[in-house]
Each structure stands twice: as structure tokens, then as C-alpha cells.
């Protein structure tokens, strides 16, 4: 079979480091009857060892040439191939609690993570290869430089941990950035639940719109000083100083006032 060339428009960098591949599969801990979805199987580096342990493996792939390759693999009878754009994929269309895994295309990682947050209630866990800088933002704590909108929104849905550092030479072609594997487990006992999630999401987006400004300035169209102080937020603080649960509390307080 002719060699597949990585396509830049699909953000393709193919994992080839056998140690990293083994570490990822061990982290996923696949059991035969698990419902597992792999995003972007590529040249099947993770697909093959997963398929060996599973009765069935769902794969989502946009590249038609790779889809054709997948159909010729010795374990193709174990694969359920979903050809198309993962940003349009209906994860709820696959029954059961799911494990989701993948070497995510870095050019769509943020919108894809937000999409996956919407199906968190039907997920056991997720393991993703991402740009290391993105993982650092996902797991960042308040008062750190990496803490921002992405971290607040994903920490609302998931407990997250950076598991594996992955250097550029682990891929072909080698990306220009370091990568990392993150584990994401849906939060079972949330500190606070947003009464109006759309309002909460809008509030967080506004809060981090201009990082150097105070929370008072960034949220002036939604909240006054009295509102901020009512939930224990100092109006002079910047957005990165405020914990996720404080954003939830503020959103609920403002939503309650509007009723």
C-alpha cells in the first residue's frame, strides 16, 4: 500500500513512538465490552492496540484516503468507521457510556473540546494528545498565567490531569511544538451547578475578554460591584484570580436577580 502523506489542512501529525503509544493504551485501560471512540485514527498507531483489546472500536476520520486504508487492515472487522468531520459528529448517536481517545488535530482542538463538554454526562473518561500549551491551559489553577476561559469552562465539566509529555520527534512529520496527553474524567460531585449554562458561558467569555483589565471593567455590562461582592469576588481582581466555582456562583446570583 502506498505511503500516506500527512495533510496540513487536516492538522495531521502521525504518532510513531511505540513507548508513547503503549503508555496511552495503558492509560485508557480498554476492556473488551467498552464503548470506545477514537478521533482521528490516522495510520492506526493507537487504533491497532486498542482493537486487539476490544470487541468493537468506533473511529471518526475525515480523510477519505485514511478511511480506505482502515478498511484494508487485518482487524477492520472490529472497526465501525464514521467518515466525516468530528466537529459535526453526533457522539450521542452511539449508545452507552463512552471512552473517547485521540491524537486531536491541533487546529480544531479548542472548539472540539467545547463540543465534547456537551456530552460529558455520557462519558466515562477521555484521553487526548494535544499541544502541551493547550493542556497546561486546561489544567491551570487560578492565579497562574495559563489560567483562562478554556480552563474555567472545562474544569466545570471535568477533572483533568496531564499524564504524558510527548516530544516532537514522537511524530511524523514532527510538529513545531511539544505535545502532552491529558486525562479528562467528568466531575461527579460538582461544587456548584450553573442554573443557566448559556449565561455562565457568556459571563466567563466576557470576564477573560481583556485579561489586563479588572473583573469590574470586563463584566460591567452584566454585574455591578455589589453583585460581585455578594458572591465574594473583589471587583479589583483580574479574571485569572477567580476560581471556577466563583464564576458559577456569580452567574447563578445574576440569573436569580433577573427572575
Swiss-Prot record:
Its main location: cytoplasm. SMART domains: rADc. Its EC number is 2.1.1.182. It catalyses: adenosine(1518)/adenosine(1519) in 16S rRNA + 4 S-adenosyl-L-methionine = N(6)-dimethyladenosine(1518)/N(6)-dimethyladenosine(1519) in 16S rRNA + 4 S-adenosyl-L-homocysteine + 4 H(+). It comes from the Bacteria. Keywords: Cytoplasm, Methyltransferase, RNA-binding, rRNA processing, S-adenosyl-L-methionine, Transferase. The keyword Transferase applies. S-adenosyl-L-methionine binds at residues 13, 15, 40, 61, 85, 103. GO terms for cellular component: cytosol. The keyword Zinc-finger does not apply. Transmembrane segments: none annotated. It is an enzyme of class 2 (transferase). GO terms for molecular function: 16S rRNA (adenine(1518)-N(6)/adenine(1519)-N(6))-dimethyltransferase activity; RNA binding. InterPro entries: KsgA/Erm, rRNA_Ade_diMease-like_C, rRNA_Ade_Mease_Trfase_CS, rRNA_Ade_methylase_Trfase_N, rRNA_adenine_dimethylase, SAM-dependent_MTases_sf. It is found in: Cytoplasm. NCBIfam families: ksgA (TIGR00755). Belongs to the class I-like SAM-binding methyltransferase superfamily. rRNA adenine N(6)-methyltransferase family. RsmA subfamily. Specifically dimethylates two adjacent adenosines (A1518 and A1519) in the loop of a conserved hairpin near the 3'-end of 16S rRNA in the 30S particle. May play a critical role in biogenesis of 30S subunits. PANTHER family: DIMETHYLADENOSINE TRANSFERASE, DIMETHYLADENOSINE TRANSFERASE-RELATED. This is Ribosomal RNA small subunit methyltransferase A. It comes from Neisseria meningitidis serogroup C / serotype 2a (strain ATCC 700532 / DSM 15464 / FAM18).
Amino acid at each position: 500500500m502506498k505511503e500516506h502523506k500527512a495533510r496540513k489542512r487536516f492538522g495531521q501529525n502521525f504518532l510513531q513512538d511505540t513507548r508513547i503509544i503503549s503508555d496511552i493504551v495503558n492509560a485508557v485501560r480498554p476492556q473488551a465490552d467498552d464503548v470506545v471512540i477514537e478521533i482521528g485514527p490516522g495510520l492506526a498507531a493507537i487504533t491497532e492496540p486498542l482493537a486487539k483489546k476490544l470487541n468493537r472500536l468506533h473511529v471518526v476520520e475525515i480523510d477519505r484516503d485514511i478511511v480506505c486504508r482502515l478498511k484494508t487492515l487485518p482487524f477492520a472487522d472490529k472497526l465501525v468507521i464514521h467518515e466525516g468531520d468530528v466537529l459535526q459528529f453526533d457522539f450521542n448517536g452511539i449508545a452507552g457510556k463512552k471512552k473517547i481517545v485521540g491524537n486531536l488535530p491541533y487546529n480544531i482542538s479548542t472548539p472540539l473540546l467545547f463540543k465534547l463538554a456537551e456530552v460529558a454526562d455520557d462519558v466515562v473518561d477521555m484521553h487526548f494528545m494535544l499541544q502541551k500549551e493547550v493542556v497546561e491551559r486546561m489544567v491551570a489553577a487560578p492565579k497562574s498565567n495559563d489560567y483562562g476561559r478554556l480552563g474555567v469552562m472545562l474544569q466545570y465539566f471535568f477533572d483533568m490531569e496531564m499524564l504524558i509529555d510527548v516530544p516532537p520527534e514522537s511524530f511524523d512529520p514532527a510538529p513545531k511544538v511539544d505535545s502532552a496527553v491529558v486525562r479528562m474524567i467528568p466531575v461527579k460531585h460538582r461544587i456548584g451547578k450553573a442554573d443557566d449554562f448559556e449565561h455562565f458561558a457568556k459571563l466567563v467569555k466576557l470576564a477573560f475578554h481583556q485579561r489586563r483589565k479588572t473583573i469590574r471593567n470586563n463584566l460591567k455590562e452584566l454585574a455591578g460591584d455589589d453583585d460581585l461582592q455578594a458572591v465574594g469576588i473583589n471587583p479589583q481582581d483580574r479574571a485569572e484570580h477567580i476560581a471556577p466555582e466563583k464564576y458559577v456562583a456569580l452567574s447563578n446570583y445574576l440569573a436569580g436577580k433577573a427572575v
